[in-house]
Structures are given as structure tokens and as C-alpha cells.
């Protein structure tokens, strides 16, 4: 699925232990979901080599990030634990999606962040990942 540059970041919010990145994609929810559930879509989001399995299944990306699938609801939500590397504390990445107008609203929330984690870098990471996921 190729998404023109109309995909926009609507907000990037931060709290003490979480960040949130919101994008509106001018594609139907069903197309966005199909893209996310294909190998290149999930790799675009989580990193090369990452594959989502059933709830409780681990995933690993070649950049060292890893986690476990926590929740998977078709055309609604994907929630994974996320570790930046083997020594990093567990955090949670929750991607919610819903129809908005003729497109899809994506809301990615990265929770349970420690004070040492660079929130600006994480916002940039997830913003870029969401764009990659919706560009192919």
C-alpha cells in the first residue's frame, strides 16, 4: 500500500512515563490492518526481522529490540512489550487504530518509560516507523 504524503502527524504528546504519536492515514482501516499484518509492515514498525505471533509469543528485531506480543485485536489494536536491548527494562507499545472520516487514525502510545529514556528520540522513532509502515 502506498500512502501519499497526506499522512500527517496530528500530535506527539508526552507524560512522565509515556509518549504518544498520532497519525491520520488517508487509507481505509482494512488496508492499514492488512499492511500491518504482513511481514514488511510489522518490520517497518518494529524493525527488520520482527514477526508478531499469537499472544505471549516473543519477537526479535535485528537491531536488538525485542519483546512479547501482549494483545492482538484485528483492525483495532496491537500491543507488545518492548525492550531496547537485552539489558533494557520492559516497556509497552500500544498501537490503536480506528476509522476516522475516509481514513484511519493511528495512535501509538509507548508506556512505562524510565526517566533515563530519551522521549524525543522515541517520538522520532515511532513517527518514522508509522510512516514506513504506511508507505509501502
Predicted segments with their positions:
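A conserved amphipathic terminal alpha-helix motif
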Residues: 1-8, 111-136
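Hydrophobic ligand-binding cavity/cleft-lining segments
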Residues: 1-51
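Tryptophan-centric aromatic hotspots in well-structured domains and transmembrane helices
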Residues: 33-36, 82, 123-126
Amino acid at each position: 500500500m502506498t500512502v501519499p504524503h497526506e499522512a500527517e502527524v496530528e500530535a506527539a504528546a508526552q507524560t512522565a512515563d509515556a509518549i504518544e504519536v498520532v497519525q491520520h492515514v488517508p487509507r481505509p482501516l482494512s488496508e492499514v490492518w492488512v499492511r500491518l499484518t504482513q511481514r514488511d509492515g510489522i518490520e517497518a514498525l518494529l524493525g527488520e526481522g520482527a514477526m508478531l505471533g499469537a499472544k505471549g509469543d516473543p519477537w526479535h528485531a535485528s537491531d536488538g529490540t525485542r519483546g512479547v506480543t501482549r494483545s492482538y485485536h484485528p483492525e483495532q489494536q496491537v500491543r507488545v512489550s518492548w525492550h531496547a536491548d537485552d539489558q533494557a527494562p520492559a516497556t509497552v507499545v500500544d498501537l490503536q487504530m480506528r476509522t476516522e472520516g475516509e481514513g484511519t487514525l493511528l495512535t501509538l502510545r509507548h508506556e512505562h518509560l524510565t526517566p533515563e529514556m530519551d522521549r524525543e528520540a522515541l517520538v522520532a522513532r515511532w513517527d518514522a516507523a508509522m510512516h514506513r509502515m504506511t508507505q509501502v
